[in-house]
Amino acid sequence: MEPNRNCPLFGGAFSAILPTGAIDVSDLRPVPDNQEVFCHPVTDQSLIIELLELQAHVQGEAAARYHFEDVGRVQGARAVHVLSVQPLCLENLSLRGCCQDAWSLSGKQQVAKENQQVAKDVTLHQALLRLPQYQTDLLLTFNQPPCHSRSLGPENLSCPPWSLSNFEQLVTSLTLHDPNLFGPQ
């Protein structure tokens, strides 16, 4: 994938700038309709964009923690640990016109891969963009498994590992083009 290319998401209803080399996981395996999932071509890094039902019973920082813990529960994490939670400046978001609240969270989850006994600490960076007028919580997740997950020898330097700034660019560039995706309002 070309660097700094605006890529359509959810059938063109959204678009965002994805990092260089991002592979659409839906080309490799089934992905739920409410998700867009991309993986790095060399590392085990991944980016997930999810449209979730608005969790109106939690507000502010508690909403970011709620979604982080929910991801851990779904993945069968043996432990979850929040490192930091910070509000995101709405003015920096392309979605500032429809996003009423935004949070970033960094944390670690101890997760075992499918068919493996040993759990590894995976660093997760999340952005929660709350769109109450669409009854939607938009959750973006950047999974950063341990660095030694795969070989990063000289032959693989053509696509360096993604950085937190790549994730931040994804979050800030995310744009809504077709609100009909959410159904009648």
UniProtKB/Swiss-Prot annotation:
The keyword Cell division does not apply. The lineage of its organism: Eukaryota, Metazoa, Chordata, Craniata, Vertebrata. InterPro entries: Mog1, Mog1/PsbP_a/b/a-sand. The gene is Rangrf. Disulfide bonds: none annotated. Residues 27-70 are annotated as: Interaction with RAN. It is a peripheral membrane protein. Monomer. Interacts with RAN, both RAN-GTP and RAN-GDP. Competes with RCC1 for a common binding site on RAN and thereby inhibits RCC1-mediated nucleotide exchange. Forms a complex with RAN-GTP and RANBP1. Interacts with the cytoplasmic loop 2 of SCN5A. Its main location: nucleus. Induction: Down-regulated in mice lacking Ovol1. May regulate the intracellular trafficking of RAN. Promotes guanine nucleotide release from RAN and inhibits binding of new GTP by preventing the binding of the RAN guanine nucleotide exchange factor RCC1. Regulates the levels of GTP-bound RAN in the nucleus, and thereby plays a role in the regulation of RAN-dependent mitotic spindle dynamics. Enhances the expression of SCN5A at the cell membrane in cardiomyocytes. Keywords: Cell membrane, Cytoplasm, Guanine-nucleotide releasing factor, Membrane, Nucleus, Protein transport, Transport. Highgly abundant in cardiac cells. Expressed in testis during prepubertal development. It comes from the Eukaryota. This is Ran guanine nucleotide release factor. It comes from Mus musculus (Mouse).
